[in-house]
């Protein structure tokens, strides 16, 4: 009986961990992410032509890029820029292959903002980075 309870407990912990990790990522559909960001008053660009064409020249199958920015005030009243960039690839293999290229883009953007920054993260066929608040708004 003790073994059963331990296994059940570990299983529940694993399920909770998966749910927590999955809730950190933006929406897996570009249109849903765009709608959520617009609702949160972000300026949003959903690009399915120019940036994907550039990535295709590099050998990557990118379908959409959602970029959003918003100027806000922090707790001390300072002006801060919230930013999120979400790359939607055709499949997980393309996302993994392009991850280092996305990291280069993220470094450039990280220098522009000193806010709570989330480094590039791979989630299924998406790669995203930006500030914590902007990523949360993209759900």
Predicted features, each with a name:
Residues 24-68, 137-139:
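N-terminal "mature-domain start" segment
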Residues 61-78, 114-122:
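Short, surface-exposed beta-strand/loop micro-motifs that present aromatic residues
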Residues 107-139:
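A short, solvent-exposed beta-edge/loop patch
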Residues 37-41, 93, 106:
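Sec/Tat-exported extracytoplasmic proteins
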